[in-house]
From Swiss-Prot:
GO BP of this protein: amino acid transport
Job of this protein: Part of a binding-protein-dependent transport system for L-amino acids, affects the uptake as well as efflux of these amino acids. Probably responsible for the translocation of the substrate across the membrane.
Bilayer disposition of the protein: Multi-pass membrane protein
GO cellular component terms given for this protein: ATP-binding cassette (ABC) transporter complex
NCBIfam families: HEQRo_perm_3TM
Gene responsible for this protein: aapQ
Homology family: Belongs to the binding-protein-dependent transport system permease family. HisMQ subfamily.
Identification of the protein by name: General L-amino acid transport system permease protein AapQ
Domain (ABC transmembrane type-1) ranges: 96-388
Location in the cell: Cell inner membrane
Stretches that traverse the bilayer: 29-49, 100-120, 142-162, 188-208, 225-245, 264-284, 340-360, 367-387
Organism: Rhizobium johnstonii (strain DSM 114642 / LMG 32736 / 3841)
GO molecular function, one term: transmembrane transporter activity
Record-linked PANTHER family: AMINO-ACID ABC TRANSPORTER PERMEASE PROTEIN YHDX-RELATED, MEMBRANE COMPONENT OF AMINO ACID ABC TRANSPORTER
Length: 400
């Protein structure tokens, strides 16, 4: 009885190689990544092709050439010159600048209020702690749009008419058309004042770093705060005087029926600014409170044992350590405030969304306008995140 020899040589076919590769985690991971990219590219191509076909079918022009067209509408509040004869592109720029104005001023104000309320919630004073708690619970549980309507319809709209404006210090007037204040008029000498201010800020930073290294090496403190204040205030003021006071003010004057002169901040911006600031501050207050609670209690007890005043313990020991806990969630609140500024359309403030909506209605370029909205808000979010990540890295605890 004869036995046939069995060929045990491995098969080297394509199917065999593919099956073998799929059992290797490295090649399997590469395959899944390539497959995912192919699917995403195919989906994007399908969306683009389908959009192009539908636009062609409806005889709708595409592209961003419409931005050179005449706007044909006015914008109530603008940081740059704008008229109805300006282009759509300039109108969008006005909207972007107004959005940035709301975001920057709102973030700054909300941070200050949030820190004060957060620290106040931990106060040993029963009344202060309870008032701060009520503030947080009220604003945190109300939709931001309702807060905006409260300030716009419930506070600013019931102010007196312009002829009965409420007089405020520094020649300012408050009425239902907004806040009128003196308009600064700059002369050419203000350029030198600005340069002096930049030099003073840079010098203050250099001195602060030198003082930090000096204290780490010798233990001797240096009054950097008062030095910085003296530089930042004193040097520009000296240049301002030497330049012949290159700044005047156009002061608003109360007339029989209206105010003349000066500048006016409309009630729409004031409502949006106040609403977003107070609303976001309630969330920041909880972040601050949680960050302070996250600092070991022994740190404050040790500082108190050294004879530091409670306010000094909070300022010098607790808050610097709490910042490492506070900064990451604080970034989310800054992003939320920036995106919530799009609610300005509800009260007629000309932010990016409101201006873009007007342009969309006139031009019909819906896809392009939506793309501009997305790109602008995405860019603002990325820039905010990058800055906060950099700041978080600077505040991180460096181990030796």
């Amino acid at each position: 009885m004869t036995h046939e020899a069995v060929d045990t040589t491995p098969l080297h076919g394509t199917g065999w190689s593919f099956r073998s590769a799929m059992y290797d985690p490295k090649y399997r991971s590469i395959f899944y990544q390539i497959l995912t990219i192919v699917i995403l590219v195919g989906f994007v191509w399908w969306v683009a092709h389908n959009t192009a076909v539908n636009l062609a079918r409806s005889n709708t022009a595409s592209g961003f050439g419409f931005l050179r067209g005449r706007a044909g509408f006015e914008i109530g509040q603008s940081l740059i010159t704008f008229s109805s004869d300006s282009t759509y592109a300039r109108a969008l720029l006005v909207g972007i600048l107004n959005t940035l104005l709301v975001a920057v001023t709102g973030i700054f104000t909300a941070t200050i209020i949030g820190f004060l309320i957060g620290i106040g919630r931990l106060s040993r004073n029963w009344l202060i702690a309870k008032l701060c708690t009520v503030y947080v619970e009220v604003f945190r549980n109300i939709p931001p749009l309702l807060v905006i309507f409260f300030w716009y319809l419930g506070v600013l709209s019931v102010l007196p008419q312009p002829r009965e404006s409420v007089g405020l210090p520094f020649s300012m007037y408050l009425n239902n058309r907004g806040l009128a204040f003196p308009k600064p008029i700059f002369d050419t000498g203000m350029i030198a004042v600005g340069i002096a201010l930049v030099i003073a800020i840079v010098a203050s930073i250099i001195i602060a770093r030198w003082a930090h290294k000096r204290q780490a090496a010798t233990g001797q403190p240096f009054h950097t705060v008062w030095t910085a204040i003296a530089l930042i205030v004193g040097l520009p003021l000296l240049v301002f005087v030497v330049s012949g006071f290159p700044l005047t003010f156009d002061v608003p004057v109360a007339g029989k029926f209206n105010l003349t002169g000066g500048s006016v901040v409309g009630p729409e911006f004031m409502s949006l600014f106040l609403a977003l600031s107070f609303y976001t501050a309630s969330f920041i207050a909880e972040i601050v409170r949680g960050g302070i609670r996250g600092v070991p209690k022994g740190q404050s007890e040790a500082a108190g044992a050294l004879g530091l005043h409670p306010s000094s313990v909070t300022r010098l020991v607790v808050v610097p350590q709490a910042l490492r806990i506070i900064i990451p969630p604080l970034t989310s609140q800054y992003l939320n405030l920036t995106k919530n500024s799009s609610l300005a359309i509800a009260i007629g403030f000309s932010d990016l969304v409101a201006v873009g909506g007007t342009i969309l209605n006139q031009s019909g370029q819906a896809i392009e306008i939506v793309c501009i909205w997305g790109i602008v808000y995405l860019s603002l979010s990325i820039l905010t995140s990058l800055f906060m990540n950099w700041f978080n890295a600077k505040m991180a605890l460096v181990e030796r």
